[in-house]
Each structure stands twice: as C-alpha cells, then as structure tokens.
C-alpha cells in the first residue's frame, strides 16, 4: 500500500526519489495523537494504523538530528498546514454558541401588570439572538468533508488495483510451480527406470560371458535383434 499524507489538501505520496518521510499517528499515546488530530482541523477524522502525515508538516526541531531528520521526537506535533478561508470560516461557525450560554425557558415570577411587557422583551432578545442560526444549513464545511471522501475513494481504487496485480502474479507463480513439479516427477520416474535396468543387468549378468555381455528380456531382445550392427572403420 502506497503511503500518503492525511493532511487536508496535501497530495504527497511516498516515492523513493523524493526526500519526504511519512510518520504514523501515535495511537499508543492518545494525548499526543489528539494534538495531531486537532492540529489537522479535519472534521470527523479518525486516524487508523494506516494513517500518516508527511514530514513537510513538521518543523525542523521536531526531528532527531542524529537520525538524519527522519525520526520524530516523542512529543513532536505537526504545525505546518495550509488552511483555506472557507475551512476556517466553517470551523468558526460550527458552534456559534459557547457551551456556557443558556437561554431561560421559564418566566420569572412577576406581577401580573408587568408580564406582557416582559414577554415582549424576551421575544425581541430571543429573535435577535437566534436569527443567525439558518446560516448553519449552508456551512461550507461540507466541502472539506467531500474532499475527505474523495481521498478515501482514491485510496480504495488504488488498493483494489494493487490487489488485482498481486493476485495475477500469484496465479502465474502457481502455474510455474506446477510445471516444475511435473518436470520433477517425470525425471524421478525416468531415474527409477534407469536404476531398475541397472539392477536387472547386475543381477542377471553371466560371469561366463564376460563384461561385454548382458542377459536381456525377450521383448527387448526381439526389438533389438533386427537392428544392424554398426561396423567399425
């Protein structure tokens, strides 16, 4: 699987000729991992063991100099990101009301003569306060989510293509292995025949005939007796 950067808008991918290193999220240290995710400003992003951030998002003091600036320090946090105005605006509008704000839901106990005036004041204040809420429906942060989805689809297509290539290579290797095994079995059978012939000749050799003679089976003799001998020069 080709390593790619998970930072928003970053298209860096691993290449042996590029002087860019990729660093996995410190999932074993939730406190540091949380700082990484917060620094990225990607909505609904959850890192996995396959998620990476490239070295271009870290300052020089984040690396260990004795490791050729390829190994991060334990508490290193990425800080070099390029955020668009739309993304920053979406984050600022994502939570228009701070958590400590509270709207009164019940009217205080007042004399009957002051109730109508108090209700009008509360309705006026509530109307002016809640008026900006419809803007939330058109927040541009959906653009960021769409881009994240495109990254995921692109990675999935590349993974599928890589799996198909590996399966094709595996199929070729299996066919090659089968051919070699068949060849080995043929050679083993041929070797057994040669050994059997040699053993037969050793057992059935007649000492009286000398070293130049052997006793052959009748079928082999009938097949060879019609062949003319080759005369010497």
UniProtKB/Swiss-Prot annotation:
Main location, first listed in the record: nucleus
Kindly name one Pfam family recorded for this protein. THAP
Subcellular location, record wording:
Nucleus, Nucleoplasm
Keyword line: Cell cycle, Coiled coil, DNA-binding, Metal-binding, Nucleus, Transcription, Transcription regulation, Zinc, Zinc-finger
Q: Which domain of life is it from?
A: Eukaryota
- GO MF annotations, alphabetized: DNA-binding transcription factor activity; RNA polymerase II cis-regulatory region sequence-specific DNA binding; sequence-specific DNA binding; zinc ion binding
What cellular component GO annotations does this protein have? nucleoplasm
* A Gene Ontology BP annotation from the UniProt entry: regulation of transcription by RNA polymerase II
InterPro entries the record matches: THAP1/10 (IPR026516), THAP_Znf (IPR006612), THAP_Znf_sf (IPR038441)
Taking the record's annotation, the residue ranges forming a coiled coil are 152-197
- The signal peptide here is none
Q: Which residue spans match zinc fingers labelled THAP-type?
A: 5-57
Q: Which family does it belong to?
A: Belongs to the THAP1 family.
Function of the protein? DNA-binding transcription regulator that regulates endothelial cell proliferation and G1/S cell-cycle progression. Specifically binds the 5'-[AT]NTNN[GT]GGCA[AGT]-3' core DNA sequence and acts by modulating expression of pRB-E2F cell-cycle target genes.
What protein name does the entry list? THAP domain-containing protein 1
Instruction: Provide the species name.
Output: Salmo salar (Atlantic salmon)
């Amino acid at each position: 699987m080709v390593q790619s950067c998970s930072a928003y808008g970053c298209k860096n991918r691993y290449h042996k000729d590029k002087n860019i290193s990729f660093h996995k999220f410190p999932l074993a240290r939730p406190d540091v991992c949380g700082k990484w995710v917060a620094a990225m400003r990607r909505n609904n992003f959850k890192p996995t063991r396959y998620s990476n951030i490239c070295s271009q998002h870290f300052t020089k003091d984040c690396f260990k100099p004795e490791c050729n600036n390829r190994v991060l320090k334990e508490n290193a946090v990425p800080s070099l990101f390029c955020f668009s105005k739309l993304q920053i605006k979406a984050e600022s509008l994502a939570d228009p009301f701070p958590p400590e704000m509270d709207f009164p839901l019940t009217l205080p106990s007042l004399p009957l003569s002051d109730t109508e005036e108090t209700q009008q004041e509360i309705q006026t204040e509530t109307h002016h306060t809640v008026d900006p809420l419809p803007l939330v429906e058109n927040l541009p942060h959906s653009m960021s989510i769409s881009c994240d989805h495109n990254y995921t689809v692109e990675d999935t297509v590349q993974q599928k293509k890589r799996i198909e290539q590996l399966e094709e290579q595996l199929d070729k290797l299996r066919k090659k292995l089968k051919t070699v095994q068949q060849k080995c079995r043929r050679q083993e059978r041929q070797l057994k025949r040669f050994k059997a012939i040699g053993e037969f000749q050793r057992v059935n050799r007649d000492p009286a005939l000398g070293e130049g003679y052997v006793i052959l089976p009748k079928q082999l003799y009938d097949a060879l007796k019609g062949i003319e001998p080759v005369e010497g020069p």
